[in-house]
Amino acid sequence: MKKLLLLFISALLAVSVQAQSNDKPGNWKLIVSDEYPADDVGVATYTVTTDFNADPTGVQDSRNAFQTALDKLGENRRGGTLFVPAGRYRISGKLYIPSGVTMRGEWKRPVKGQSIEGTILMVDSQGGNETESNSFITMEPSTALTYLSIWYPHQDPENIKPYPPTVLYGRDGVWGNEYCNVRHVTLVNSYSGIILSRSNGGGCPNIYDVYGTPLSRGIEIDNIADVGRFEWIHF
């Protein structure tokens, strides 16, 4: 009987190990760059270009590649980091970052009169309204957006059009929405930059080392349940 039990347990372990190996992420790698130094060292679970064929030239729409990668990391609340190497990525549509997931690029602090460098997400939308449900990036609880820039190529500062928020803290229908983080990010010509959801807010929002040229409002925090942290905001 003991031998049969041991054989049964061994078989279960073998199945479990096999299942994990079939579902393991891509090539884990340290995110280290002399050209784009960071305050910390990240570990990439997936790389959006090599693992999901996103186009870093900005010619092809990369929205599906990004969302597929983010959803993969969010499966079973596994979490992880999606690394977005330096380049320009055209995004025609909305992105959702699931709980426990970080989207991380390569970034330099902007310098007046110089071009933005590093990872640039290009919002390929004509705008026209400011509806929260159409936010460019919506973040669920315990997520992070770090080391990248977001640019609105169709926005004209001389003829400003309303756009939905660039980053929305709090996804409708998801309870909580605590601990959303934006760190080391540049917002180029956002109409509304970082907004805590007016309909489904949360607590403990974090914003650190953010630069930008918002055209209506940079950060809007209301309907908050717990204290947040906001440091080094440069608008």
Question: What are the roles of these predicted feature ranges?
Answer:
Residues 66, 116-137, 147, 157-174, ...:
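Extracellular beta-strand/beta-solenoid scaffold signature
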Residues 1-85, 90-158, 163, 181-183, ...:
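Extracellular "leader-to-stem" segments immediately downstream of a signal peptide or signal-anchor
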